[in-house]
UniProtKB/Swiss-Prot annotation:
Keywords: Coiled coil, Cytoplasm, Isomerase, Repeat, Rotamase, Stress response, TPR repeat. GO terms for molecular function: cyclosporin A binding; peptidyl-prolyl cis-trans isomerase activity. Residues 328-354 form a coiled coil. The gene is wis2. The keyword Repeat applies. It is found in: Cytoplasm. It catalyses: [protein]-peptidylproline (omega=180) = [protein]-peptidylproline (omega=0). Its main location: cytoplasm. Induction: By heat shock. This is 40 kDa peptidyl-prolyl cis-trans isomerase.
Amino acid sequence: MSTYAYFKISIDGKIQPTIYFELFDNVVPKTVKNFASLCNGFEKDGRCLTYKGSRFHRVIKNFMLQGGDFTRGNGTGGESIYGEKFEDENFELKHDKPFLLSMANAGPNTNGSQFFITTVPTPHLDGKHVVFGKVIQGKSTVRTIENLETKNDDPVVPVVIEECGTCTKDQIEAPKPDVTGDSLEEFPDDYEGDKSETAIFKIASDLKGIANKQFAQQNLDTAVAKWQKALRYLMEYPVPNDDSKESPDFWKEYNALRYSIYANLALVALKQNKPQEAIRNANIVIEASNSTELEKQKAYYRLGCAQGLLKNFEESEKALAKAGNDPAISKKLAEIRQKKKDYKKRQQKAYAKMFQ
């Protein structure tokens, strides 16, 4: 019978979905006992050894997250329940997939309290580190930590184990939808449901609908997060598979969904005064070989607006000239041309003063 454990983690003070682990005590009981005891808190020599309050001090994207140094917090400390270090129990389990829980060490037989969670298969660690568990829920939290900004592999914001302990399988809380009603894994690699072309299209469409609703409510950051999530799922099929049974019309809809999301991201970037992001998203649509003329025109309009914010009036004018003949576009183009004239006048006056 497996042991189960959990971490309630905060990132920069904000509580994340709980991570639950299944521990393999039928394979490595001594290693599991050490981890489980440190989750619950272990009294030793008048001290309580515990992961509670400790942080993840090392994060490497496409590799792993490391924590468990509750004495120094920088990867040089930690202590096991058996003493400072204990031996490698066995290497029966392999690092053959993401979300495995394994012991960090400084060489053979130097296990303490530090552990790591893999985010990809890491076979080069086989025979060197003891695998003793896996993440069974809360994978989105692992991915969120993995994608944090770091400096020298140390997250720039604190990632803290606020609460931890062991539990029974029945005590594991079912995944809860977030405030938008979305309960899907953040990354499609972690999603274990139907990944057919039509299923992915529906998932992305639903996520776009959630994002659009958040946008209408002026929850711009949430809208952006959901649109970006939809794009991650759509990237399961960046181009149709050679053996795809779906019709050309289906793939037109698929691409239209993708490009509408990029256009929306460009729009929000403009609202948030992030012109470079708007330019990046607009250019994806413009440079795509299979985007429609109408999609390109919409993107050119947003590109023109973004260049205008950067006072790149020549580039703004060029983009807006390709955005179609809508009255709103003509008005924006006239506005940019006037701003360009005013800007040149100010420059001329400034230069004239320099030589007086």
